[in-house]
Amino acid sequence: MKILFLHPNFPAQFRHLAATLGQNPKNRVVYGTNRREGSIKGVTKVLYEKSRTAKAETHHYVRPLENAVLEGQAVYRLAQSLKDSNFIPDIIYGHSGWGPTLFMKDVFPKSKLLCYFEWFYNAHGSDADFDPSDPINADDEARIRIKNAPILLDLYSCDRGLSPTKWQKQQFPVEFQPKLKVHHDGIDINYFKPVENAKLILPRINLDLSSVSEIVTYVARGMEPYRGFPQLIETISILQRKRPQCHFVIVGKNRVAYGKSLPDNQTYKDVMLKKFPLDMERIHFTDLLPYHEYLQVLQASSVHIYLTRPFVLSWSMLEALATGCLIVGSSTAPVKEVIEDGVNGLLVDFFKPRQIAARVIEALDNPDKMKAIRAKARETIVENYDLHKLLPQHLDWIMQ
């Protein structure tokens, strides 16, 4: 079997699939990407690079499409070189949206094309118009509509597609949903597991909270409104007054991963820390962490805050549940698909820092009561998101 994976990042969502398929000597697994770092045993990584990025003078609605076409064009050239070297994949599996899969049916018309569909953009009813303080206008509506162009081309071209959650599948046009299967990538429950009385000591960044009894954690790729960062900082300002022994660990980069950036190179971290003066001795910004350090943060967490607009569900929330974290999460659709209030976590209004703080205090004040919720949190992942159960099913789906 010859399999071609396509994703601008490496190994991304295809890490376990590529590794498992690469272990079989009967398979030839090739991974097309533009990320140079990293390797997987049994997988041949081949690189592509866009000739340029979208030009500034391109209409701003069309820039994402132009970038996707340029990505697809680079992958087309890569695919043609693979074809010239007699590599004709039986299966192509790529991530839709960036553009790598756009022209695969032109190079390999007989190959099965599978696409990983993470998100379909809608101006109303999900992330874009969620915040009443940041309303969208006609320009936004038009821009968002055009942003789906490369995804729509993939929906048309692919043989089948996969979406990781029910909520994410529901964002796609109804007429294409029969093509999509809901199947999560899976969480490694043998890696993400609780450790009783875990202490947080990270020598690499000189962080030692081994003597701290209350640690509230937060994890995100960036620090932005999409993942509730402004609400988090306001919540911390309330909690610092009410819990003088509590420390806060924020894992993430000082950037915007999703949504709009602020003008004049400002960051949401800088703006929020000016707005809410905090005791910086009790708040620890770690930047992004290697997996083993990130795991230690989750294992030592007293309460883990997860906030998101109605958008793509973060792997980190599921990893936190698997680790037995007590999650205080936003009562938004992607979270409610997994967490039931008072059963395997505590839900709060995304926009109400006082309520978020109150539920964090509720969790800190009732550790015995929360043990059952923590146990149920892990049970949720073991039963429904266990990588070792889902990976064989994912492989079966690919081979259909």
Positions of predicted regions on the chain:
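N-terminal subdomain of nucleotide-sugar transferases
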Residues: 1-44, 388
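Acceptor-binding helix/loop patch of EC 2.4 sugar-transfer enzymes
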Residues: 52-62, 111-149, 190-199, 254-263
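Donor nucleotide-sugar binding/catalytic pocket of nucleotide-sugar-dependent glycosyltransferases
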Residues: 122, 140-213
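Acidic donor-binding loop of glycosyltransferase active sites
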Residues: 159, 296-312, 325
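Conserved donor-binding/catalytic core segment of Leloir-type glycosyltransferases
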Residues: 203-227, 233-238, 248-249
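Nucleotide-activated donor-binding/catalytic signature segment of Leloir-type glycosyltransferases, i.e.
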Residues: 255-256, 261-288, 292
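Conserved acidic donor-binding segment of nucleotide-sugar-dependent glycosyltransferases
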Residues: 341-342, 346-353, 362-367
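A short, well-ordered alpha-helix in the C-terminal region of glycosyltransferases
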Residues: 355, 362, 369-384, 390-396
